[in-house]
Amino acid sequence: IHIPHTWPGFWEKFYFKPGNLGFPIFETAYAKIGVYICYDRHFPECARLLALKGAEILFNPSATTAGKSQYLWQLEQPAQAVANGVFIGANNRVGLEKPWEFGRFYGSSYFVDPRGEIIVKGSEDKDEVVIADLNLDEIREVRDGWQFFRDLRPDMYTDLTRPGSS
């Protein structure tokens, strides 16, 4: 949905168009899942819309390099998991991209539970598959306890969609 334009190396606005398919939910044999890609994790509205549409597990495939992004990687998605009562699988690549070498991709893929706790985490420098057993009953337990969706006030958020509100 959102396209970054940052230095060094991420000049994606020149090569890609923003997505326009909205936030679809995919019903699998195991859970309802939603996907928001890389840069979209910086926009909490993406995770919120997926959760409001019924997603139980969100996935965020990313290719992000060390620096400030690494701090945000540990902060944003656990916060989104709590705010939306979902599991999140945050996956990031590792290594260098030759020949450009504009930064080290720091891996650190993880699963976070609806309470914001990281339940399994990958390494910073090895290609690997991160696997977790997710108890979907935790979603209902957390949502019933914290009631964030019940207490939403959409009537107070209209400025978010009004032209010129930024």
Tell me what each language-model feature is:
Residues N92-S166:
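C-terminal beta-strand edge segments of enzyme domains
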Residues E56-I57, F87:
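Short, Asp-centered acidic motifs that coordinate Mg2+ and/or phosphate
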Residues L75-E76, A83-F87, R93-L96:
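Catalytic phosphate-donor-binding core of small-molecule kinases
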Residues P61-A63, N91-V94:
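Short secondary-structure boundary segments
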Residues P18-N20, A83, R104, E124:
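A generic fold-level signal
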Residues I1-E56, A66-A79, G145:
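Active-site catalytic loop in hydrolytic enzyme cores
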